[in-house]
Amino acid sequence: MKGKFIVIEGIDGCGKTTQIDELSKWLPNSGLIKKGSKLITTREPGGSLLGKKLRGLILDNNKNNKPSSLAELLLYSADRAEHVSKIISPALNNNDWVISDRFSDSTLAYQGYGRNINLEIIKNIESIVCQGASPDLTFFLEISPEESIFRRKNEIPDRIESEGIRFLEKVNEGFKLIAKQKNWKVISASQNIQTISNQIKETLLNNFSNNK
């Protein structure tokens, strides 16, 4: 894989979508992307055509349709397998840049730390699902669970967003542990949008300016 794969992670309400929008405006003219290459922005769940259908199943807030924790894990895995096969791998092999709103570490945080599914089981599944795709750099936009809930107070929540604060706390602690690995950059998402954006841009320039 020759392109660059960037992932934005964090609990709901941390501003991932906003920052990806900022990057999509800046990156094409940043000098980082080689001539002839493109920028692809995507998300999980729902980055592929099949994924959009799976997203509806996963996030449906009808309590009568609530999947078991294991079924939820496998739905996310199916979404990711299709996402990697149809979107991520072809783009990277074409020298394109891919920025994804969530990837496999969200599954570790939400289904592993949040749902208490054995982490080794998840890692084994992901080793198959990801098909060798691994982020070059992951940004963790960190906010407190309390701030997450406050920011989303006027929104209609999906099923995952409807979980209580204890679930969010477990997920957030999971992200903090995962973010200790290399190729992660932790940024406080309590700052204003432009400050966060500038920190992301600076990190990208520092990491990839010599790879043009």
Swiss-Prot record:
MF annotations from Gene Ontology: ATP binding; dTMP kinase activity
SUPFAM superfamilies registered for this protein in UniProt: P-loop containing nucleoside triphosphate hydrolases
Reactions this protein catalyses: dTMP + ATP = dTDP + ADP
CDD domains: TMPK
UniProt KW keywords: ATP-binding, Kinase, Nucleotide biosynthesis, Nucleotide-binding, Transferase
Enzyme class: transferase
GO CC terms: cytosol
InterPro entries the UniProt entry points to: P-loop_NTPase, Thymidylate_kin-like_dom, Thymidylate_kin_CS, Thymidylate_kinase
Residues annotated to bind ATP: 10-17
Enzyme Commission identifier(s): 2.7.4.9
GO biological process, one term: dUDP biosynthetic process
Function: Phosphorylation of dTMP to form dTDP in both de novo and salvage pathways of dTTP synthesis.
Family note: Belongs to the thymidylate kinase family.
Name of this protein: Thymidylate kinase
Organism: Prochlorococcus marinus (strain AS9601)
Gene: tmk
